[in-house]
From Swiss-Prot:
Ribosomal protein found in the keyword field: yes
Record keywords: Cytoplasm, Nucleus, Phosphoprotein, Ribonucleoprotein, Ribosomal protein
Complexes and interactors: Component of the small ribosomal subunit. Part of the small subunit (SSU) processome, composed of more than 70 proteins and the RNA chaperone small nucleolar RNA (snoRNA) U3.
Pfam family, any one: Ribosomal_S6e
PTM per Swiss-Prot/TrEMBL: Ribosomal protein S6 is the major substrate of protein kinases in eukaryote ribosomes.
One GO term describing the cellular component: ribosome
Cross-referenced InterPro entries: Ribosomal_eS6, Ribosomal_eS6-like, Ribosomal_eS6_CS
GO biological process: ribosomal small subunit biogenesis; translation
Localization per Swiss-Prot or TrEMBL: Cytoplasm; Nucleus, Nucleolus
Function: Component of the 40S small ribosomal subunit. Plays an important role in controlling cell growth and proliferation through the selective translation of particular classes of mRNA. Part of the small subunit (SSU) processome, first precursor of the small eukaryotic ribosomal subunit.
Organism, scientific name: Glossina morsitans morsitans (Savannah tsetse fly)
Main localisation: cytoplasm
Annotated family: Belongs to the eukaryotic ribosomal protein eS6 family.
Name of the protein in its database record: Small ribosomal subunit protein eS6
């Protein structure tokens, strides 16, 4: 079995091939996310703690977190699920994945060093790979350099040098800072708030006009009903008086 070990502190990863079944037994029947002591792998691993982050079986099917079995299952996966990338919007597909329990049928096991031991491992903990890109968001640049909200973050952007071309000056490239508070951003915010207040005032005025018109219409309809009621009562009195005069 191959062990793909990574160390986030240095940004390095290295592939180790272990053929001794006794050394690998420490990983068997363990779930993804569990932490394992790596002392059994050798003297250089003494004191190291490894977290199981994934793996593939001998046919290349990946392990999936949450599937509590060591066999292969077919699951209906959609956007947002691991082990699947949809090609169309809303597409779902039934894919074969392996459970999150490690057994002897694994070909590669992905491990992350949680705790470093006494000795350095060549190519993994003794060297450091610098990050190619720095932070892009303004709040993360402030956090990296311990800046306050009033400090300007633009001078602190990590620039990436580009190789010089034929007879040209070497240049560097910097990312566009996201969520940077500038006077234009504040002006747009003020405009949004002003438009919102204007819409609220307009809707309040329209509601008042509608309520006024509704009250007027109700008053007019009530007056019409009362007028019709008076006319009916007057016509009934006239008809009664005419009937009584005819009888005399």
């Amino acid at each position: 079995m191959k062990l793909n070990v990574s160390y986030p502190a240095t940004g390095c990863q290295k592939l180790f091939e272990v053929n001794d079944e006794h050394k690998l037994r420490v990983f068997y029947e363990k779930h993804m996310g569990q932490v394992v002591e790596a002392d059994i792998l050798g003297d250089e691993w003494k004191g190291y703690m490894l977290r199981i982050s994934g793996g593939n079986d001998k046919q290349g099917f990946p392990m999936k977190q949450g599937v509590l079995t060591h066999d292969r299952v077919r699951l209906l996966l959609k956007k947002g699920h691991s082990c699947y990338r949809p090609r169309r919007t809303g597409e779902r597909k039934r894919k074969s994945v392996r459970g999150c329990i490690v057994d002897a049928n694994m070909s590669v096991l992905a491990l992350v060093i949680v705790k470093k031991g006494e000795k350095d491992i060549p190519g993994l903990t003794d060297t450091s790979v610098p990050r190619r890109l720095g932070p892009k968001r303004a709040s993360k640049i402030r956090k990296l350099y311990n800046l306050s909200k009033v400090d300007d973050v633009r001078p602190y952007v990590i620039r990436r040098p580009l190789p010089a071309k034929d007879n040209k000056k070497a240049i560097s490239k910097a990312p566009k800072i996201q969520r940077l508070i500038t006077p234009v951003v504040l002006q747009r915010k003020r405009r949004r708030i002003a438009l919102k207040k204007k819409r609220q005032a307009a809707s309040k005025e329209a509601a008042a006009d509608y309520a006024k018109l509704l009250a007027q219409r109700k008053k007019e309809s009530k007056a019409k009903r009362e007028e019709a009621k008076r006319r009916r009562s007057a016509s009934m009195r006239e008809s009664k008086s005419s009937i009584s005069s005819d009888k005399k």
